[in-house]
Amino acid sequence: MAVIGIVSITPALPLIANELNISKEKIGILVSVFTLPGIILTPIFGIISDKLGRRFILLPSIFILGFFSILSFFARDFYLLTIFRFLSGIGAASLGAMNITLIGDMFDNVKREKILGYNNSVLNLGTTVFPFLAGILANIHWSLVFALPSLAILIFIWLLTSFKDIAPAPKISEKYFRNFLNLLKNKVLIKIFIVNLLTYIILFGSLWTYLPLLMSQRFNAEPFFIGLTLSSMSFTTSIFSIFFGHLVKKISYIKLFSLSFILYSIVLFLITVVSEWYYLFIATVLFGIGHGLNLPNIQAFIIRLAPDTHRSGIIFLNRTISQVGQTAGPLISAGILFLFPNTNVSINAVFYFSVILGILLAVFSQFISTKNN
């Protein structure tokens, strides 16, 4: 549920743009407006979760996501669809952080890194299957892609009777907020937040939002093949996430960061030069390897730096930063498209920008200490 609201619609973005007569600069709004509510609400949900428990936030969130996704299915006007996407994004705001919080609640330090790898594997299994299914559904009708996040209603009904809070909710006091603010002075934590922000600007500014547009315009690819290509990246990510717990025993966290971002840059450049759409499989598989090393690495740092009493708040703040990247990425790319009216040049410029960010991240990650300071 944490990823379905985005990855289930990206294969259909070119088709939605054509059907609703929306320009290539505006179509990314459907992604940005979904992630926008999380920028404000996610840290608030994290604090409430620490005070009132995980169930208090989790159940309403899943219901809201499902309900407004159903309404999105029936929308035939771009602006109405945008409103429903925004409202469903309110429901999705807490979900990406909640699963990490629950892992922190349930497992000790010895098991967390392995479980984080498994969690990312499951997460990316979703981002493998859903774009593929969305591509099939979009070939029937573009609105059917919104049927997938509507499944959240069924999850809500199941959790309503089966989910109970695992961790006791501590009292929120002035001391809690004071200690929380002190945690934000941690230099390592700040650097990880920066890495997380730029990672999602790359991911959503180029791959998830504008790779479908590139495939549609340059190769005339149908939604099914767009979904298949995006799924290949997520499948590889899920495989490598499984082995994260083993890899960190042999390769340092910092080297894994560097390898991830170097792969990002290589892949994003390759995307601009391939001559046939099926060559993109090589690029997306390589990107999936890099992302499978990067994402659990970020999460492992965050959990290790966050004490039990503030874990939810810190994880939710990190999720907020992710959503800033998810929101800003498509908007930055839209700005690049606006600056370069020629379609081929503008699409390439979007990916060149991400190549530069990847190189900068590879250098920046070398200044991250593995010590808590």
Can you name each region flagged by the protein language model?
Residues K164-F193:
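Juxtamembrane intracellular "pre-TM" segments in multi-pass secondary transporters
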Residues I40-R76:
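Conserved MFS/SLC helix-loop-helix module at the cytosolic interface between two early adjacent transmembrane helices
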Residues T42-G53, F240-S252, L337:
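Helix-to-loop junctions at the C-terminal end of transmembrane segments
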Residues F68, Y79-L87, Y278-L286:
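Paired small-residue
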Residues F78, F84-L123:
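Cytoplasmic helix-loop-helix junction between adjacent transmembrane helices
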Residues Y118-T161:
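Helix-loop-helix hairpin linking two adjacent transmembrane segments in secondary transporters
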Residues S150-A169, L361-S369:
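C-terminal membrane-cytosol helix-exit motif in multi-pass small-molecule transporters
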Residues N21, G53, F74-L80, D108, ...:
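Helix-breaking motifs and short loop linkers at transmembrane-helix boundaries and internal kinks
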